[in-house]
Structure formats: structure tokens, C-alpha cells
Amino acid sequence: MSVPIVPTDFAHAPKLEQLKNEFVECYDTDDSRKFFITRSPGRVNLIGEHIDYCQFSVLPMAIENDLMLACRLTSESENPSITLTNHDSNFAQRKFDLPLDGSLIEIDPSVSDWSNYFKCGLLVAQQFLQEKYNFKGPVHGMEIYVKGDIPSGGGLSSSAAFICAVSLAIIYSNVPAGTPILKDELTKTTAVAEHHVGVNNGGMDQAASICGIEGHALYVEFKPELKATPFKFPEDLPISFLIANTLVVSNKAETGPVNYNLRVVEVTVAANVLAQKFGVTLQTEGNLGKGTLRNFMDSYYTKYDKSCRKPWDGEIQTGIERLNKMLQLVEETLDPNGYTLDHAVELCGCESISQFTELYLTNFPVRFQRLKLFQRAKHVYSEALRVLKALQLFQKGESNFFEEFGALMNESQESCDKLYECSCPETDSICEIALKNGSFGSRLTGAGWGGCTVHLCSTDTVDSVKSALTEQYYNLRFPELTAEELEDAIIISKPSLGSVLYE
């Protein structure tokens, strides 16, 4: 499927007309040069937390809040440049020249500036143009006006939406007219863009932003390749999702050694302890290059299942059977009391603490007394299982979808809290308030330790959930919030359309 390119009478599209008017106010009214708008939405992950870096699939959706770029090609031919203006005055205007020889734009990740994210989208688009079309010249210069309503820093992937809209604009303006821009190619192109500013993401955000479909969630797979498959919510159900920000920010530099970084180490060590126990070899994949819990599952079945010595191909029923087996092995093999460093060294087959440290503890700073391998592995396998059970609900289209999907979300929150320990008191409080006031399922979304929560509601109950959260959480904990800040903290959205280009 290709990104929709929609011929548009801007005078009959109020939101787009407003954006064009603001562009004209910023620049000028020269209509002789090509003008177009690219749009990409934010996303929220409905289920499947902290399992993407274990190579298991996740279930996000695109939200209605989006980011748009109003773009106009410049007439300059000798010195092409990009001029960036942001509707938000907190982001100063930027202008930079484009390499005349067609070489890739340079990015300095040590400099924290919003234009670096534009350059990320530009750079990967340049690479795509060179690889697919043998594009050699400099890309077209443009004047660009940026506007969006995705709260930044709220865990809804505003940066990914920005990059997707940028890459779409660069590719569209540098290929022959009428050339389709395929969604899967744009997804794979942008999936690695943020790596250029030091963000080690895996592609879920970009897949959801680009491939979103109204009324659908997206089953995003990472193996054998990045792929997004839409699953439709039951048509006759008035579904709404409420996304509430705890307004708690976890400083990753300070808390990483005992939170996120440590979880990456624990799931990797768990995979290797299981591999040693069952005599299988893991591929050099994952964040530490030492294999993942998905690798262990595939290696286990390759060795022990005589009927099918193949890695899992994503088929739902097979995945459910295999994940249930993995949960059984975790219960039988790993100790709920945790592992000291010495014990982990022995079970991983390392010869010394120094060897274990070199293999597992040097990529990221970590601190621990005991490694909770049982809890982390149980969360990963059970969360991956919940994703597949959610897909079964989509396929059945059952009348009690609210209750059953909500139950999976609640189980996910329980697992994130008790097994992965990535919740926090504020998240727990928001979920409790929401469930008492009309939410069918409430859970954290994103990395956790603060950040956002997501709640499954009906259109009949979503307003009561919002009112309860306003009165019982925000007004009590953050009485200084302005009306605008409160509006950013609570977002109501239905599953939305992904990237679009208007010309």
C-alpha cells in the first residue's frame, strides 16, 4: 500500500486552510511554486510493553493528534537550503544549506536542537532516494512551516511523527510526479532515523504513525522483518481511548541503572540462562548482542520439536502454544527469589565475573543486588501472549469485546507493575480512578516509571473518566496546571489514519 496523496481544495478543508494561511503569513503568497502538506500522527501502544527489544510483536494504534508540515519548493538552484519555522515559538526558526554534491546531511548529535530531528528525516530520505532511484543530485530546497498538537515529551511519539512527515516530504518532492510512496518502504526508511541522534528505537513508532488506519489497531512485527498488519475494532462498538499523562518524568540518566538499563540486562541474562539449561545457541541479536527471549523460544523449538523445526513465523495459534510452553519452562527453571552475581555467572556458563561483566554489564550502567530473571522473563512471555490473545478478539469480533480486551489491558498493567516493576504510584492511582469511573481497561503505555497511561472507554463513559481524573488526580496533585496544560495531559482519540500527503 502507498501513502495516500490527496488532491485537495484547501478552501474546503478548514484545518488545512488554516495551516496554509499561517504558512503564507510566515513566508509570502508566491503561488508559482509547488505547495503541499504532509501529515503524520502520534501513536499509543495498547498492549505489548517492554517486549519489542525482545523481538516480540506489539499492538499500537495511530491517534488523531498529528504533526503537519506545510512545504513549498524554493526556486534557488545554485544554493538549495531548508528554512524551518515552527508554530510553537519555543522552537526558533532554523535555516541550513543542503550539500551541493548530493552528499548526506551531517548531524551533530551532541547538539540538542529541534532541527536535528528534521535532519534525521532528511538523511534517511536521502539514503532511500540514492538506494532506490540512484538519486545523485542535491535535494530540492524548501520553506517549511511545522504545526502539531501531539504533546512533546508525553510518550506519544511526537518526534517519530515529525520525522515521518519530513521523510515523506523529502521523498515526494524529489521523485517523478505520480510516483507511489509505499508505506512499508517509508516505515523501514524512518525506523532507524532517530539512531542518528542517539535514540535506539525499534520501528514501532514509525510503523504506527505511517500505517495507521481509522478504526484499526496495528500488529507490528519485528521478525523476520518490520511489518504492520491492521486489525479492525468491532464496527458496532463506540470505542474511544483516553490517554492520560501522569506528569511524572523519569530521568533516564539517573534511574536507568536500576530501571530501563537493568531490565535490558535481566531479559538478556534470562535468555542465556535458559539457553544454557536447555543446550541451545542464541543468535547475536538484541540490545546487548547476546540474544533475546524470542531467540531462545525459536532455538528451543528448532531443537526439541521434531514436527516443526522452524522459528515462529508469527502465526497466532502457534505463537500461543509456544508462549505457553515458554511460561512453563520459566516456572520450572528460573528462581523467583532472584540471582546473585556469582550465581548468574555460573548459570550463564561464564568463567569469571569479569567475563560476565564484559558480556552483559558494559553496554549500559546498571546497579543491582539480585537479578530478577524469573519475573522479567515471565512478563515478556505473558505480555507477548496477551498481544496474540488480543488479536484473537479482533478476529472473533465478540460482543463482549470491551470486557475481554479491557481485561487483557488490566492484566498487562498488573504484569508491568508486579513482574517488570515499571509502574509507579501515580500510574497506579490514575488507573484505579479510571477503572472506577467507566474505563474497561487501564494500563501504562511507553517505558513506564511515569509517563502516559491508556484507557479503553466507550463514547458514553469517556467523559466521566476524564472528569474523574481531572478532579481526583490533576486538581489534587497539580493544582497549578493551566487549562491548556490540562488539555495536553488528557487526550481522547479513536484509532486514526496514518501518514497522508495533501497537494
From Swiss-Prot:
In which residues is alpha-D-galactose bound? 43, 49-50, 52, 201, 205, 260
Marked site (Transition state stabilizer) residue numbers: 43
Enzymatic reactions: alpha-D-galactose + ATP = alpha-D-galactose 1-phosphate + ADP + H(+)
Task: Say which enzyme class the record assigns.
Answer: transferase
- Supply the induction statement: The GAL1 gene is a member of the family of galactose inducible, glucose-repressible genes (which include GAL2, GAL3, GAL7, GAL10, GAL80, and MELI).
* Binding-site residues, ATP: 153, 155, 157-158, 250-252
Positions annotated as active site in the UniProt record: 205 (proton acceptor)
Mind telling me which InterPro entries this protein's record contains?
Galactokinase, Galactokinase_CS, GalKase_N, GHMP_kinase_C_dom, GHMP_kinase_C_sf, GHMP_kinase_N_dom, GHMP_knse_ATP-bd_CS, Mevalonate/galactokinase
Recorded metabolic or biological pathway in which this protein acts:
Carbohydrate metabolism; galactose metabolism
- Disulfide bridge partners, by residue number: none
One GO term (biological process): galactose metabolic process
The UniProt similarity line reads: Belongs to the GHMP kinase family. GalK subfamily.
Provide the function of this protein. Galactokinase is a key enzyme in the galactose metabolism where it catalyzes the conversion of alpha-D-galactose to galactose 1-phosphate. Can also induce the transcription of the GAL genes in response to the organism being challenged with galactose as the sole source of carbon.
Name recorded for this polypeptide: Galactokinase
Organism annotation: Kluyveromyces lactis (strain ATCC 8585 / CBS 2359 / DSM 70799 / NBRC 1267 / NRRL Y-1140 / WM37) (Yeast)
User: What is the gene name?
Assistant: GAL1
